[in-house]
Amino acid sequence: MPETFVSERFGEITYTQDDVLSFPRGLPAFENNRSWVLVGDEDNAVKWLQNIEDGALALPVTTPDAVMPDYNARIPEDELELVGSMDPSDLALLIVVSIPEAAPWNMTANLRAPILLNLKTHRAVQVIALNEEYPIRHVVSTSGRLRPSSRPWPSSSSSCSSSPD
């Protein structure tokens, strides 16, 4: 059954429970906010992870391939267990981007801490990739697919692999 809430950024949003991403431990700095939906323009690689418990809380995200086509985060096995799957075909990654309001062309992406999604259960967790070479503030070129903006589920084409702790 559809439900609605009001987002400060997007106004009234209608969603179903199948749209909700459940973060069992929240996100860093937002540990108490555990239910989120993806919203945004179909034709824009930047989507918004909108919290349904706090209409003021929305984070811009994108798929790693929009930022770095050869991105291959190594994810600790215990994080894979937390989302309930070790099968790469069940998993997808999102990257949180930072878009400075006064200078959106200075967008950066946090490649070090991707969001790991189980596409079947909609459980998600932000993880620290074991790839130390991935920066927290990777400068993003806005000349390609990315442009700062405003539902589809991310494709599972972005690669992630497990690594023992």
For the regions a language model picked out, list residue spans one by one:
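Long, compositionally biased stretches
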Residues: 2-68, 88-165
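Extended catalytic/binding region for NAD+/ADP-ribose chemistry, centered on the ART fold
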Residues: 70-75
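Short active-site loop/helix that positions an aromatic residue
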Residues: 77-87
